[in-house]
Amino acid sequence: MRFLNIFLFFAVMIAFVSASPVLEEEEIDIEPRITCDLIGNERLCVVHCLAKGFRGGWCDSRKVCNCRR
C-alpha cells in the first residue's frame, strides 16, 4: 500500500509539472543610443566597448555606439 501511495504521488507530480505552461522569456529592449547621448559623448561609448572586451569604439551620425574589434 505504501509503494502505491509513493508511486501515485510521483505520478501526480510528473503530470503536474508537465501540464504547467512554459513561461515565455521576456524580450530585452536594448537602446544602443544611450552611450552616445549622455554626458561624455564618445567617451562613454569607448568605456562601454572596453568593458565588453573590444579595443574601443565611436559614435556614428545616428548616435549609435560601434565597437572596434
Curated annotation (Swiss-Prot):
This is U-Asilidin(12)-Dg3b. Is abundant in venom, since it accounts for 45.2% of precursor counts. Keywords: Disulfide bond, Ion channel impairing toxin, Neurotoxin, Potassium channel impairing toxin, Secreted, Signal, Toxin, Voltage-gated potassium channel impairing toxin. The keyword Lyase does not apply. Has the structural arrangement of an alpha-helix connected to antiparallel beta-sheets by disulfide bonds (CS-alpha/beta). GO terms for biological process: defense response to Gram-positive bacterium; humoral immune response. Residues 20-33 form a propeptide. The recombinant peptide moderately increases Kv11.1/KCNH2/ERG1 currents and shifts the voltage-dependence of the channel activation to hyperpolarised potentials. In vivo, induces neurotoxic effects when injected into insects (tested on L.cuprina and A.domesticus).
